[in-house]
Amino acid sequence: MSLYRRLVLLSCLSWPLAGFSATALTNLVAEPFAKLEQDFGGSIGVYAMDTGSGATVSYRAEERFPLCSSFKGFLAAAVLARSQQQAGLLDTPIRYGKNALVPWSPISEKYLTTGMTVAELSAAAVQYSDNAAANLLLKELGGPAGLTAFMRSIGDTTFRLDRWELELNSAIPGDARDTSSPRAVTESLQKLTLGSALAAPQRQQFVDWLKGNTTGNHRIRAAVPADWAVGDKTGTCGVYGTANDYAVVWPTGRAPIVLAVYTRAPNKDDKHSEAVIAAAARLALEGLGVNGQ
């Protein structure tokens, strides 16, 4: 085990380490992430949780970052929660017109004449980040305020969704609209995929949708061996270097890891980097003593 890995793990578990002050430990833990930020030219927020030991890795974990499309995972979870009280909801057909097809609606645009079921829209929103599908589901839940209310109901006081696709992608620095924190995202994801926030059948459906995501191969998934199961949801705003990914990772022979990586940059034309997200995920996994790649 590397010195860095030991220090991160010890710091996160709040164990004393002779010869190191708390400040020295914090600096040693933060240094690799700070270097990655310097190379990126922006800010990186990370929160990772080992559900077996309870250890965590945290860097800018309480700061707000734009959600971009990552809200769509929680949107699908909210739909599943409602389906627990509303029998047949997932099989309900939703018809929509051409005016619903905002840019990047790769699945919903194929079914303009037939419509899609709520379950099909949910899968499209999670696995293909389909924007029209997300807006149609938001409408069913009472808009952005309805999704925010669902997140409050599971104990998340940080998440807020204020706008619809595509407006929510503005990612203006300092704007609290349509944001959350890496820690809040990770903790909510844990509740929904591994905890009791959803009943068992709905929880399994949510996990299956996340595992089937097609947009995250170069983000957190790139930081783990190919034979580990991963369920994730990405987001990319397209401005201010803003992108993200959150995931549940099932390492072979140990308890799941839940983590979130969010990025932002100061200038509107700054580019996001999938490689930076993958690198941050590797650092977080290393800090938890997990051998990624």
From Swiss-Prot:
Not inhibited by EDTA, inhibited by clavulanic acid and tazobactam. Inhibited by cyclic boronates, including vaborbactam and bicyclic analogs of taniborbactam. A beta-lactam binds at residues 69, 72, 104, 129, 131, 234, 236. It holds the Pfam family Beta-lactamase2. GO terms for biological process: beta-lactam antibiotic catabolic process; response to antibiotic. It catalyses: a beta-lactam + H2O = a substituted beta-amino acid. Keywords: Antibiotic resistance, Hydrolase, Plasmid, Signal. Its EC number is 3.5.2.6. One of its GO terms (molecular function) is beta-lactamase activity. The active site is at 69 (nucleophile), 167 (proton acceptor). Changing residue 178 to N: Reduces thermal stability of protein. PANTHER family: BETA-LACTAMASE, BETA-LACTAMASE-TYPE TRANSPEPTIDASE FOLD CONTAINING PROTEIN. Initially two different KPC beta-lactamases were identified from two different Klebsiella (KPC-1 and KPC-2); they were later shown to be identical. Belongs to the class-A beta-lactamase family. This is Carbapenem-hydrolyzing beta-lactamase KPC-2. It comes from Klebsiella pneumoniae. The gene is KPC-2.
